[in-house]
């Protein structure tokens, strides 16, 4: 369970509701929840939510849009990617290979749940050329990362579209306010009409910053974690195939992990590592 995402979204909406409720009748107390009615407008909902949804549909393939529930499920039920655990498994394989040879890895590989890890081990068990193995695995990582990037970009585009349609709604409201203004009746309704016009901008900003941006950020973070683990697998498998010492392999991978943590080892387009295909 991704508690930080849930706490952030729920906490953000709660604070917004409290903020919108402050400043009512003093006799009621510090919070006047009847003021929430001031922030409700059906036309604004249609413009912002409808316009944003139309942008998502028009700009993305149907297969990707249909996986929206899956994307949300990934975020809420976030699987942890543990690079240290990956290193431990690689060292275990290195010890088996050093003691019994590469062919002895097949039995242990069949017990792996990660298809990418299993594929990587089986490629060296089958005696494939090391350069071809690296190229194949790196290509898999790049393709996975590209698909993940497309998914995250969909939500980033939605976060840009929501405030834009909020502004469209505001302009529509202002136009209607000016057209319907009664020259003889004065400007007594301008404040109310202006408030309604600004509600669409409010909806757009909330939708962008409390819904779409957090989703996109979580998906990108998850992609980075997956890609890091996959790259560790590639480096480890290559070291096993070349017959390197298990202790040296551990130090090498831990050094790679430390370099990545300091920002020096992130090479997304060259093939960052990960485990799984959740965002596809």
Where do the protein language model's features map onto the residues?
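Helix-termination/interfacial motifs at the ends of transmembrane alpha-helices
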Residues: 7-10, 14-30, 140-222
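Large intracellular
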Residues: 3-5, 18-152, 225-280
């Amino acid at each position: 369970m991704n508690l930080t995402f849930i706490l952030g979204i729920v906490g953000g909406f709660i604070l917004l509701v409290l903020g919108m409720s402050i400043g009512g009748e003093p006799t009621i107390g510090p919070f006047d929840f009847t003021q929430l009615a001031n922030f409700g407008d059906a036309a604004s909902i249609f413009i912002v939510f409808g316009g944003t949804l139309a942008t998502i549909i028009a700009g993305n393939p149907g297969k990707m849009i249909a996986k929206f529930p899956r994307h949300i499920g990934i975020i809420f039920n976030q699987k942890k990617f543990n690079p240290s655990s990956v290193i431990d498994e690689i060292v275990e394989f290195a010890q088996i290979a050093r003691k019994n040879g590469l062919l002895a890895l097949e039995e242990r590989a069949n017990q792996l749940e990660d298809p990418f890890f299993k594929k990587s081990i089986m490629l060296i068990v089958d005696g494939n050329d090391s350069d071809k193995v690296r190229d194949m695995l790196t290509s898999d990582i790049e393709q996975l990362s590209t698909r993940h990037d497309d998914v995250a970009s969909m939500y980033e585009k939605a976060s840009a579209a929501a405030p834009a349609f909020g502004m469209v709604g505001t302009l529509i409201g202002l136009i209607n306010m000016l057209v319907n203004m009664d020259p003889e009746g004065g400007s007594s309704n301008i404040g109310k009409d202006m408030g309604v016009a600004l509600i669409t901008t409010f909806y757009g900003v909330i939708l962008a910053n409390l819904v779409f941006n957090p989703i996109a950020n979580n998906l990108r973070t998850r992609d980075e974690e997956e890609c890091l683990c996959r790259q560790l697998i590639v480096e480890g498998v290559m070291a096993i195939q070349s017959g390197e010492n298990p202790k040296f392999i551990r130090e090498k991978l831990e050094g790679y992990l430390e370099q990545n943590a300091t920002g020096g080892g992130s090479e997304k387009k060259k093939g960052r590592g990960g485990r799984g295909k959740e965002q596809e």
